[in-house]
């Protein structure tokens, strides 16, 4: 098995994937900003890929290209390795972009008490909550500056701030009791 990083522009994505599979590659990992294209490009999508509208893994089986999103399962596996239980917990999900969309289905399967999506753009967070409307009773949308009336058990950062070397400014009372 060999593993190598290749830079591919979005306009060249489909041609590059086809070329790699023709060269004998059996699978590919895909990262930002190409995950949505990967999901749309595939002939067959896993349930996770369909739900979140993105894929980070492509593979060829016969003449068909398959897509999967393993981000959510990876996060859940990490929680399990750390003995972190999500059932009946209050979870804050920072951000409502592609990463949040990719992990939300897996989070919901673990039956948290509530998932509160905090985002700068409330409209974008509402759209994400609407996408998973069957579970909306457990999903709340809040402004990133809104004072919470509960203490979260788990906070997940799915924003791009860390990759952009930016800070996320959150109200102190999310993490600390007021004196």
Model-based region annotation:
Residues 1-82:
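Phosphate/diphosphate ligand-binding glycine-rich loop within oxidoreductases
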Residues 135-179:
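Rossmann-like adenosine-cofactor binding region
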Residues 26, 113, 153:
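Conserved acidic residues
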Residues 69-72, 79, 84, 88-112, ...:
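Glycine-rich adenosine-cofactor-binding loop
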Residues 38, 103, 164-166:
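Glycine/Thr-rich phosphate-binding loops of Rossmann-like dinucleotide-binding domains
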Residues 2, 90, 113-114, 138:
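Residues at the starts of beta-strands that form the adenosine-phosphate
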Residues 110-133:
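NAD(P)-binding Rossmann-fold cofactor-contacting core
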């Amino acid at each position: 098995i060999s593993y190598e990083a290749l830079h591919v522009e979005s306009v060249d994505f489909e041609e590059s994937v086809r070329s790699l599979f023709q060269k004998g590659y059996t699978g590919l990992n895909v990262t930002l900003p190409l995950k949505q294209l990967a999901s749309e490009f595939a002939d067959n999508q896993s349930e996770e890929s369909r739900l979140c509208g993105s894929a980070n893994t492509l593979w060829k089986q016969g003449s068909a290209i398959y897509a999967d999103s393993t981000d959510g399962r990876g996060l859940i596996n990490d929680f399990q390795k750390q003995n972190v239980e999500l059932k009946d917990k209050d979870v804050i999900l920072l951000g409502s972009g592609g990463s949040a969309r990719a992990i939300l289905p897996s989070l919901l399967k673990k039956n948290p008490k509530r998932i509160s999506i905090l985002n700068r753009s409330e409209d974008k967070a509402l759209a994400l909550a609407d996408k998973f409307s069957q579970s909306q009773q457990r999903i709340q949308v809040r402004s990133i500056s809104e004072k919470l009336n509960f203490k979260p058990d788990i906070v997940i950062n799915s924003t791009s701030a860390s990759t952009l070397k930016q800070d996320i400014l959150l109200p102190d009372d999310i993490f600390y009791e007021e004196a």
